Amino acid sequence: MSDTLTADVIGRRVEVNGEHATVRFAGVVPPVAGPWLGVEWDNPERGKHDGSHEGTVYFKCRHPTGGSFIRPNKVNFGTDFLTAIKNRYVLEDGPEEDRKEQIVTIGNKPVETIGFDSIMKQQSQLSKLQEVSLRNCAVSCAGEKGGVAEACPNIRKVDLSKNLLSSWDEVIHIADQLRHLEVLNVSENKLKFPSGSVLTGTLSVLKVLVLNQTGITWAEVLRCVAGCPGLEELYLESNNIFISERPTDVLQTVKLLDLSSNQLIDENQLYLIAHLPRLEQLILSDTGISSLHFPDAGIGCKTSMFPSLKYLVVNDNQISQWSFFNELEKLPSLRALSCLRNPLTKEDKEAETARLLIIASIGQLKTLNKCEILPEERRRAELDYRKAFGNEWKQAGGHKDPEKNRLSEEFLTAHPRYQFLCLKYGAPEDWELKTQQPLMLKNQLLTLKIKYPHQLDQKVLEKQLPGSMTIQKVKGLLSRLLKVPVSDLLLSYESPKKPGREIELENDLKSLQFYSVENGDCLLVRW
């Protein structure tokens, strides 16, 4: 085995037949002669053992089948950053042009060159590069010092995800030469991060840093971003992060923080990042979050936490209590929320009901699940909410005369916006509360006539359809019934309460309830 292998090979990232691994051992493995590398695979199913052979432990793996012994000549140790860029971005000239001889003068001496035009063209191509994508290109190091800065001075965005980089120091050696670097993605590199302090200003103009699936800890995050004084977006998906301390002098400029798929995070840890002054977007999808409380704010008050938070994403979690959304009403700047695939929101038949309840619970919300909340939808949601819980309000001490209101604390806690809705729309009348409550009718059936204005020979039908049924599903039903492609169908409706007015059902994702379709209305079908 060569001296190079023994000197610096341990800890290096390597690629073998498309699979990535980390070198854990270099040496002889008796009784077979010659040098071997012991590697731990990223995919443990690729290995054969745990680093042992015939009773001798040569290295240790996290998984019992995560290790293998491989000959050094079978392993790809990767390439340097600049070579990878040239391989990917430099256009090769034809063979004849490459061989063209030229005489150039350097100083006072004439020098014969071959392919001088080609070299100049390569340098021109590289110097113009601003965005570089080197995903899965086996980049393992920076290469010759100063080479990147000289060849590619204008790079602003680099994707180095899924390469063979083994340490944050190596990332810095690359980034240090890119003085205009604003976006850096090193996801899916198993990086060793520094344990000591990091020099500030290393990534002085960096705005976006992506560290998904790198194995970084929260303490390491805080050390690394100390070198990014202007950082605006930080992505930390799938790192098993536990937020262990409050950021004090770092992350103060961050506007977007993605903590998706970090299953160790809970609401107590979120308090540690709750005072980041510029944080506008927080992504907590697939973290297992089920509850959130802002104890500093009482009923009807705003919290001092997350002062700038405008957009919260909590998809794929365990949210099962409506109190979660009551707490979000306390966030002073919240305008957009995404909460798909949670126990409270994932049932198709209840999706419209859940949407209306969330809208009624969070007064300042403008967008829910990437769908704009129009004024008429908010009005309907709030009126339905006021009506649905009207009897409960009365039983809890509610009264049309505000001076006679004696609402229980339990009701105010469960419905913190109800009093405001009574002020906005008036208290519910007794006659309103005698009818069936719309929000409680999960499967309310509407009896509708179905007519075909352009097909006069078609018989008028009468169908019972759930009010929560989406326009898309209504079209699917009619498509099967009429043997007409869904894409050809245009739907509208008319109501005896609105004579002479036809209302288009143009959004396939909305329900019949959304368009205020009621019993006795008539669907108009055209194709």
Swiss-Prot record:
What UniProt keywords are attached to this protein's entry?
A: Acetylation, Chaperone, Cytoplasm, Cytoskeleton, Disease variant, Dwarfism, Intellectual disability, Leucine-rich repeat, Neurodegeneration, Phosphoprotein, Repeat
Which Gene Ontology MF annotations are present?
A: alpha-tubulin binding; protein-folding chaperone binding
- Tell me the PROSITE patterns matching this sequence: CAP_GLY_1, CAP_GLY_2
Which GO BP terms apply?
adult locomotory behavior; developmental growth; microtubule cytoskeleton organization; mitotic spindle organization; muscle atrophy; peripheral nervous system neuron axonogenesis; post-chaperonin tubulin folding pathway; post-embryonic development
Keyword Repressor annotated: no
* Residues found modified as N-acetylserine: 2
Report domain CAP-Gly positions: 27-71
Where in this protein does the record say Phosphoserine is found?
Answer: 495
Q: Where are the LRR repeats?
A: 154-175, 180-200, 205-226, 230-252, 253-274, 278-299, 308-329
Q: Which Pfam families match?
A: CAP_GLY (PF01302), Ubiquitin_2 (PF14560)
Indicate the segments forming the LRRCT domain, all copies. Answer: 342-384
Q: Which InterPro entries does the record associate with it? A: CAP-Gly_dom_sf (IPR036859), CAP-Gly_domain (IPR000938), LRR_dom_sf (IPR032675), Ubiquitin-like_dom (IPR000626), Ubiquitin-like_domsf (IPR029071), Ubl_TBCE (IPR044079)
Which subcellular locations apply to this protein?
Cytoplasm; Cytoplasm, Cytoskeleton
| Statement: the UniProt record of this protein carries the keyword Cytoplasm | yes
Record-level GO cellular component terms? cytoplasm; microtubule
N6-acetyllysine (modified residue): where?
463
Q: What is its main location?
A: cytoplasm
| Family the UniProt entry places it in | Belongs to the TBCE family.
Q: How does it assemble?
A: Supercomplex made of cofactors A to E. Cofactors A and D function by capturing and stabilizing tubulin in a quasi-native conformation. Cofactor E binds to the cofactor D-tubulin complex; interaction with cofactor C then causes the release of tubulin polypeptides that are committed to the native state. Cofactors B and E can form a heterodimer which binds to alpha-tubulin and enhances their ability to dissociate tubulin heterodimers. Interacts with TBCD.
Role according to the record = Tubulin-folding protein; involved in the second step of the tubulin folding pathway and in the regulation of tubulin heterodimer dissociation. Required for correct organization of microtubule cytoskeleton and mitotic splindle, and maintenance of the neuronal microtubule network.
Q: From the Swiss-Prot or TrEMBL record, give the protein name.
A: Tubulin-specific chaperone E
Q: Which organism is it from?
A: Homo sapiens
